[in-house]
Amino acid sequence: MSSKKKQKMKRSSSTQVQALAQHISMSAHKARRVVDQIRGRSYAETLMLLELMPYRASYPIFKLVYSAAANASHNKSFNEADSFISKAEVNGGTIVKKFKPRAKGRSYPIKRPTCHITIVLKDRSKKKTDQDMFLGTKNV
């Protein structure tokens, strides 16, 4: 990724990994259309869906999901087959404003929206409920 597009990984708990892509050059509304389709799905199903979707927003989201899974397997020893998208959100970023020259010395403003995409992966095999922790049983 270029220096403008940053990717971060945050550690929040032992069963989830968060990946963040910032300043992606597309409208948040168009990216939300794709993110709404993958929320709650398994990792393998998500990759298959994103490869087949005809939207321009699916490629950066595909790269982010793939990177989050690689970070999860490397840093937290998650099995990618057991991972699923627990949270996926798109927030609006800054708007890049340009001016296009027009006839007779006029200019026309152009607004290029950006967005920030957050993907949270959870591991089903390491998921424990409060009751299981209290009773000491293992959730399979």
UniProtKB/Swiss-Prot annotation:
Keywords: Chloroplast, Plastid, Ribonucleoprotein, Ribosomal protein, RNA-binding, rRNA-binding. SUPFAM superfamilies: Ribosomal protein L22. InterPro entries: Ribosomal_uL22 (IPR001063), Ribosomal_uL22_bac/chlpt-type (IPR005727), Ribosomal_uL22_bac/org-type (IPR047867), Ribosomal_uL22_CS (IPR018260), Ribosomal_uL22_sf (IPR036394). GO terms for molecular function: rRNA binding; structural constituent of ribosome. The gene is rpl22. Disulfide bonds: none annotated. One of its GO terms (cellular component) is large ribosomal subunit. NCBIfam families: rplV_bact. It comes from the Eukaryota. Part of the 50S ribosomal subunit. Its main location: plastid. This is Large ribosomal subunit protein uL22c. This protein binds specifically to 23S rRNA. The globular domain of the protein is located near the polypeptide exit tunnel on the outside of the subunit, while an extended beta-hairpin is found that lines the wall of the exit tunnel in the center of the 70S ribosome. It is found in: Plastid, Chloroplast. Belongs to the universal ribosomal protein uL22 family. It comes from Calycanthus floridus var. glaucus (Eastern sweetshrub). Signal peptide: none annotated. GO terms for biological process: translation.
